[in-house]
Regions:
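Hydrophobic alpha-helical segments
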Residues: 1-176
Length: 176
């Protein structure tokens, strides 16, 4: 059970309604995470702006973007974001076989060299970012642009924050 119920549009103040309208315009849905953060409307706006920026124009393919996000959410064991991003990953083209192999991607032939590097980056950023070797960084730079690498790292950081909020606030998965 959620610690705070999502703030519904009818109960929202004008600042919150404005954020909801922008999220709805850009994404077609206002997720429960956004509705729950509306309990603090001064926190809601910057988080929603970051959420929209990371879900808008991207230097990454949607497939890689969702791979990075889903791996982050799975590592954090966040039911809310895993449920949402499993569906988005499938919509982006990942199969059930890929999703089953995600936890043991290193030994899987389902993922390309580039996809495995993105997954490895998620693990390193999430656990020991200061231990990313120059060799691995060069490898990343050989097939991702600096824009793409920065975006992947930002996705890991942002969704790490969202996962912690969702876990602490016990946000329930969105209804399809």
């Amino acid at each position: 059970m959620p610690r705070y119920l999502p703030v519904q549009n009818e109960a929202a103040n004008e600042r919150v309604k404005s954020v909801y309208a922008e999220v709805m315009r850009q994404l077609g849905v206002v997720p429960n995470a956004i509705k729950t953060l509306a309990h603090s409307d001064r926190i809601l706006k910057p988080v929603a702006d970051a959420y929209l920026a990371l879900n808008g124009e991207s230097g990454l393919s949607e497939k890689i973007r969702q791979l990075v996000v889903l791996k982050t959410c799975r590592l954090d064991k966040c039911a809310y974001t895993v449920a949402r991003h499993t569906e988005l990953a499938k919509s982006a083209g990942w199969t059930d076989d890929h999703l089953k192999a995600l936890d043991d991607y290193v030994g899987s032939d389902l993922f390309s060299f580039y996809e495995k590097d993105a997954l490895r980056l998620v693990e390193l950023v999430r656990s020991t970012p200061d231990e990313i070797t120059n060799e691995f960084w060069t490898q990343l730079d050989n097939h991702y642009t600096s824009d793409q690498v920065v975006e992947m790292i930002t996705l890991v950081g942002f969704y790490g924050m969202i996962n912690r909020l969702a876990l602490a606030l016990q946000i329930e998965p969105d209804k399809p």
